[in-house]
Amino acid sequence: MQVHVIRRENRALYAGLLEKYFRIRHQIYVVERGWKELDRPDGREIDQFDTEDAVYLLGVDNDDIVAGMRMVPTTSPTLLSDVFPQLALAGPVRRPDAYELSRIFVVPRKRGEHGGPRAEAVIQAAAMEYGLSIGLSAFTIVLETWWLPRLVDQGWKAKPLGLPQDINGFSTTAVIVDVDDDAWVGICNRRSVPGPTLEWRGLEAIRRHSLPEFQVIS
């Protein structure tokens, strides 16, 4: 599985893939999870945070999207700032070096697979790889509270921004996660991700920071 970076600079190269991506989001969030407020007549799940500022990481295997994630600069409107501000006691994070992660998914047929690294781990490691590459120092995430131990177990330093609250019947919290070398190397080693996975097609002009030396621990 390779993870493609899609930004405003190369979005035209991925028009067809993005169309599939938004339809997969509809299937997962509207049909499977029942978020009917996101339903649209065109069968795509697109919200107010799918702007030109959004960055998409799409995991592709044999030309099929199997995992995805959206990243939004916290200097722009985010889920935390505009929908769930009550989850951050000190107010939503707004920093040029921090992005919000959202719409993180793996398609049903790839969930829980055991042949090699799981798609879930690859897409999350790709987020850390992207953050390091462009010089970020933090991610914010609005998530169901049961996710917290899993983040810690994969080597991420996740700090709650407030107290968990019941949202639509689910205990939900907001966290800030450090983006650093240890977080990327940690998830790769703990989840058997074999190093860098990002494809920067059409983004050759983007200045990227070097990644730390990586060695798989067997």
Curated annotation (Swiss-Prot):
The keyword RNA-binding does not apply. It is an enzyme of class 2 (transferase). InterPro entries: Acyl_CoA_acyltransferase, Autoind_synthase. Its EC number is 2.3.1.229. It catalyses: 4-coumaroyl-CoA + S-adenosyl-L-methionine = N-(4-coumaroyl)-L-homoserine lactone + S-methyl-5'-thioadenosine + CoA + H(+). GO terms for molecular function: transferase activity. Induction: Repressed by RpaR in the absence of 4-coumaroyl-homoserine lactone. Induced by 4-coumaroyl-homoserine lactone. Keywords: Autoinducer synthesis, Quorum sensing, S-adenosyl-L-methionine, Transferase. GO terms for biological process: quorum sensing; signal transduction. Gene3D superfamilies: 3.40.630.30. Catalyzes the synthesis of 4-coumaroyl-homoserine lactone, a quorum-sensing (QS) autoinducer molecule which binds to RpaR transcriptional regulator to regulate expression of QS-dependent genes. Belongs to the autoinducer synthase family. This is 4-coumaroyl-homoserine lactone synthase.
